[in-house]
Amino acid sequence: MSNLRQLPHRRLLWLAVALLFASAIAAAAQPYAATAKDDQTPKGDSRFTTLDGARIHYVNYGKGDEALVLIHGWTCNIDNWRDQFADFAKRNRVIALDLPGHGQSDKPQVTYSMDYFARAIEAVMRDARVKRAVLAGHSMGTPVARQFYRKYPDQTLAIVIVDGSLRPLGDPAIMDRLIAGFRAPTYRDAVGKMLAAISGPNLSADAKERINASALNTPQHVIVSAMEGMADPSIWGNDKINVPVLAIMAKNPFYGPNLEETFRAIAPKLDFQMWDGVGHFIMMEKPKEFNAAVISWLDKNNLLKK
């Protein structure tokens, strides 16, 4: 496999495959519980729209026909972005959604493809009367944002990649083994241990609890189907992203030396940052630094000015 085809998330896959064969640690699903920090988080306008008859939940901060749209990752939800709302909403309109199958959105028995998720974003933007957006995608949110750009290029101002991938997750054999673990009755153990392995040193106990609660309450059919969606080779083309792209990645030894080159081959207007001392959930581990980096980049590119 060439460097161009190596995954930015090799760390995640390597750990996940190994963990699927490790001894299981039982983990019970638990509902999201409010914490003291909830009182300090600004309250957005909670709304619902529909896609193919299913309700999609989102929160809105501010007004205007352009917005920063925050897209969470696999088995996550809006809560992952709670430390971004206050800082970002001071500058521009912000929308965060629960992708279908996640959070407060409906969880129908459908195929959870990246295309389906992209259509959900378009439905939210249409309901919110947002004409164009900067899409910030964490983890799985990156291929979702890219698929949105493919389908709705005129509605895409720019993309922010948060420890996400622009290349395939792995060869079919690896992906089949990974997905098989999530089909098993012990899937919650595999998900919980996988999340623990990719969490960084600065992630608070409260944040870990919220991440685990979200993941372990995501229905199994969503967990499996969304991972199958990320394994779909059709979403990993070499087609260019011709809008500005900011990539904030967590440094780790599995990325290799050519990650920036790999990204730039697809996204010529790339601003690439590799951060030391963080894990996969960068925006939760170092929220102030993350927020400042995104705002600085938005300012530099004259995006979403009020």
Tell what function each PLM region has:
Residues 2-16:
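Bacterial N-terminal signal peptides that target proteins for export
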Residues 14-26:
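Bacterial N-terminal signal peptides
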Residues 45, 51-54, 59, 96-140, ...:
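Active-site loop/oxyanion-hole signature of alpha/beta-hydrolase fold enzymes
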Residues 54-104:
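Conserved HGGG/HGGXW glycine-rich cap/lid loop of the alpha/beta-hydrolase fold
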Residues 143-151, 155-186:
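Flexible "cap/lid" loop of the alpha/beta hydrolase fold
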Residues 169-174, 182-240:
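Conserved alpha/beta-hydrolase catalytic His-Asp/Glu region
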Residues 245-278, 284:
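Conserved loop-alpha-helix segment in the C-terminal half of the alpha/beta-hydrolase fold
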Residues 270-306:
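Catalytic active-site module of serine/aspartate enzymes centered on a nucleophile-bearing elbow/loop
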